[in-house]
Amino acid sequence: MRDNLFIYLQYLLPHTLTSRLVSKLADSENKIIKNHLIKLAIKKFNINLVEAKETDISKYKSFNDFFIRELKDDLRPISNDKNVISSPADGVLSQFGTITDNSLIQAKGKLFSLESLIASSSTTSFTKFATIYLSPKDYHRVHMPIDGKLTKMVYIPGKLFSVNKITTSKVDNLFAKNERLICYFDTIIGEIAVIFVGALLVAGIETVWHGKIAPNYYKDIQTWDYNSAKFNIKFNKGDILGWFNFGSTVIILTSGNNVSFKFEENKNNIKIQVNQDLALITE
């Protein structure tokens, strides 16, 4: 009953307006406001500040600045093996596996189509997926899972439902309904996509090459082509791609048939850390 009420209230909320108001508050550099919000978040979400590069909350310019805090150097070691695909984020590996009949698993008993997720019928190259949920207590920066060159970025406006366990089990096609930013890369295994999925109270998605995109800033699908010679934007495995200004979800899509996950496919909701081995590229 409580779960259904939580979902019902989300249908009533003005998603974009709510998230933009949160963004204004979270960007405030008023010391009293931002310090209070940071202390409240640390207590509410049990945030481990010991891992942060900066542990003095007074040094953060705003609540958002705190939420995208950096980790201490070498805290998340990464494999140098080119055949290892690394986790792009701290969080929970909620679902992963093979894309079958153009469908991905959202939650137990719930599927959604790849075509609806990327808003394109050109889906034939993607064969595997992994979904990582970032809770408010997690590190919020997203890193490159494999060496690659940025070829395209697509912004898709949408709803801003919460993406927690309750909502993913109750709302059909959740990740295809929510706002999302899809980043395409050319890699040694072919094309991959790293998808930033927006959510309720997420005050924006940012990438290191484009900057911030506020919740539903664009009313229509937007595409940026980075494939021309004048861009040549390359990333090494482990490089920072961008971040969420609150908890949300990252989905990785990979091509080909030579990717094998490090975990048993009948398991889910596995705690994972950024740079941890996620999958192997087999011969």
Curated annotation (Swiss-Prot):
Is synthesized initially as an inactive proenzyme. Formation of the active enzyme involves a self-maturation process in which the active site pyruvoyl group is generated from an internal serine residue via an autocatalytic post-translational modification. Two non-identical subunits are generated from the proenzyme in this reaction, and the pyruvate is formed at the N-terminus of the alpha chain, which is derived from the carboxyl end of the proenzyme. Keywords: Cell membrane, Decarboxylase, Lipid biosynthesis, Lipid metabolism, Lyase, Membrane, Phospholipid biosynthesis, Phospholipid metabolism, Pyruvate, Zymogen. It catalyses: a 1,2-diacyl-sn-glycero-3-phospho-L-serine + H(+) = a 1,2-diacyl-sn-glycero-3-phosphoethanolamine + CO2. The modification Pyruvic acid (Ser) is found at S248. The active site is at D90, H143, S248. The record marks G247, S248 as: Cleavage (non-hydrolytic). One of its GO terms (molecular function) is phosphatidylserine decarboxylase activity. It is a peripheral membrane protein. It comes from the Bacteria. GO terms for cellular component: plasma membrane. Binds 1 pyruvoyl group covalently per subunit. GO terms for biological process: phosphatidylethanolamine biosynthetic process. Its cofactor is pyruvate. Its main location: membrane. InterPro entries: PS_Dcarbxylase, PSD-B, PSD_type1_pro. PANTHER family: PHOSPHATIDYLSERINE DECARBOXYLASE (PTHR10067), PHOSPHATIDYLSERINE DECARBOXYLASE PROENZYME, MITOCHONDRIAL (PTHR10067:SF6). Catalyzes the formation of phosphatidylethanolamine (PtdEtn) from phosphatidylserine (PtdSer). Heterodimer of a large membrane-associated beta subunit and a small pyruvoyl-containing alpha subunit. Belongs to the phosphatidylserine decarboxylase family. PSD-B subfamily. Prokaryotic type I sub-subfamily. This is Phosphatidylserine decarboxylase proenzyme. It comes from Francisella tularensis subsp. holarctica (strain LVS). The gene is psd.
